[in-house]
Amino acid sequence: MSFNFRIGQGYDVHAFGPGDHLMLGGVRMAHSHGVLAHSDGDVVLHALCDAMLGGLALGDIGVHFPPSDARWKGADSAQFVQHCDQLLRDRGWRVGNADITVICERPKVGPHALAMRERIAGLLAIELDAVSVKATTSEKLGFTGRSEGIAAQAAVLLGKIAA
């Protein structure tokens, strides 16, 4: 049986470390900390990539961009999204919509949500209303609640491109 839709979900987390900004959803935002990561550590775009790859059973971000590969040191995660999008398109699929949740106490994501949505919609060449970015806290519980790091979840609906 063949379906014209698939769902993918992704999750990413990074610990806070030295620095004065974060990259979230392709948007640079001032923050009291950076993140410990091989690339730019954009948890939003990393979770999005994992969701896109997962929808077509293409592995995960670590398979395509291993931290052991020096090419990805400090890399802009937008490159990862573009690569994943091309993998989907090469197989006849596109992202129909993306729903992303950032989990953190700080920074406050709300003021940056529109810019993040615009950046992601642009990377995927989809409508702005097909990208949702929202945030929640963990009510001071766990590593995000103690402000030790940041996490993101993403869900995507993939659609088969009509021939």
Curated annotation (Swiss-Prot):
Involved in the biosynthesis of isopentenyl diphosphate (IPP) and dimethylallyl diphosphate (DMAPP), two major building blocks of isoprenoid compounds. Catalyzes the conversion of 4-diphosphocytidyl-2-C-methyl-D-erythritol 2-phosphate (CDP-ME2P) to 2-C-methyl-D-erythritol 2,4-cyclodiphosphate (ME-CPP) with a corresponding release of cytidine 5-monophosphate (CMP). The record marks H38, T137 as: Transition state stabilizer. One of its GO terms (biological process) is terpenoid biosynthetic process. Keywords: Isoprene biosynthesis, Lyase, Metal-binding. NCBIfam families: ispF. The keyword Nuclease does not apply. A divalent metal cation binds at D12, H14, H46. 4-CDP-2-C-methyl-D-erythritol 2-phosphate binds at D12, V13, H14, H38, S39, D60, I61, G62, T136, T137, S138, E139, F143, R146. The keyword Transferase does not apply. One of its GO terms (molecular function) is 2-C-methyl-D-erythritol 2,4-cyclodiphosphate synthase activity. It comes from the Bacteria. Its cofactor is a divalent metal cation. It catalyses: 4-CDP-2-C-methyl-D-erythritol 2-phosphate = 2-C-methyl-D-erythritol 2,4-cyclic diphosphate + CMP. Belongs to the IspF family. Its EC number is 4.6.1.12. Homotrimer. HAMAP family: IspF. Pathway: Isoprenoid biosynthesis; isopentenyl diphosphate biosynthesis via DXP pathway; isopentenyl diphosphate from 1-deoxy-D-xylulose 5-phosphate: step 4/6. Binds 1 divalent metal cation per subunit. It comes from Xanthomonas campestris pv. campestris (strain ATCC 33913 / DSM 3586 / NCPPB 528 / LMG 568 / P 25). This is 2-C-methyl-D-erythritol 2,4-cyclodiphosphate synthase. It is an enzyme of class 4 (lyase). InterPro entries: MECDP_synthase, MECDP_synthase_CS, MECDP_synthase_sf. CDD domains: MECDP_synthase. It holds the Pfam family YgbB.
